[in-house]
Amino acid sequence: MKNLFRPLIVIFAVLTAVTGLAYPAVMTAVGQAAFSDQANGSMLEQDGKVVGSKLIGQQFDAPQYFWGRLSATSPMPYNAQGSGGSNLGPTNPALLDEIKGRIDALKTAGTDMSKPVPVDLVTSSGSGLDPEISPAAAAYQIERVAKARKLAANDVQALVDRYTSGRQFGILGEPRVNVLQLNLALDEMKHG
């Protein structure tokens, strides 16, 4: 019986050491050495203080800032612990109420409503944490942000263009604009 358990205990100990200690330690070391920014959460700083991650959206609702997608997390917007979609189907009246509420907020903030509203400004993403919007959603907000900040619309457009990322490897995903990075650049523009 003793001979039966000895190999099992040895295999268990070796696999625990390899998969539970050695592999995570090596991957952590490689991540820190080769991809330090990403391994530490892709944090963004302003005036030497961490203000957020470029991977997690933040709530912006003041007219002088670009607004991101709606957050489906509750009870607080952009709460990473509550990540998940709203699960509201296209025929659910609550989804329509949510969309109407966002359109009303855009009107109240002074957005020109003569153009069609980009869908990503009035719907939440699958995770509820999306940090990016489409270039169309950013362009839709340029006039409002420029007016609120007393800037030329062309200057704000140039900033949007600068912070627009293309498709990954030229084929994956869609062009996108990181809202937090764009808003931080706007704040720098005002201070600088």
UniProtKB/Swiss-Prot annotation:
Assigned GO CC terms: plasma membrane
Subcellular location: Cell inner membrane
Membrane topology: Single-pass membrane protein
GO molecular function: ATP binding; P-type potassium transmembrane transporter activity
Keywords assigned by UniProt, alphabetized: ATP-binding, Cell inner membrane, Cell membrane, Ion transport, Membrane, Nucleotide-binding, Potassium, Potassium transport, Transmembrane, Transmembrane helix, Transport
TM region(s), chain numbering: 7-27
Function statement: Part of the high-affinity ATP-driven potassium transport (or Kdp) system, which catalyzes the hydrolysis of ATP coupled with the electrogenic transport of potassium into the cytoplasm. This subunit acts as a catalytic chaperone that increases the ATP-binding affinity of the ATP-hydrolyzing subunit KdpB by the formation of a transient KdpB/KdpC/ATP ternary complex.
Assembly: The system is composed of three essential subunits: KdpA, KdpB and KdpC.
UniProt similarity note: Belongs to the KdpC family.
UniProt-recorded name of the protein: Potassium-transporting ATPase KdpC subunit
Species per Swiss-Prot/TrEMBL record: Paraburkholderia phytofirmans (strain DSM 17436 / LMG 22146 / PsJN)
Gene: kdpC
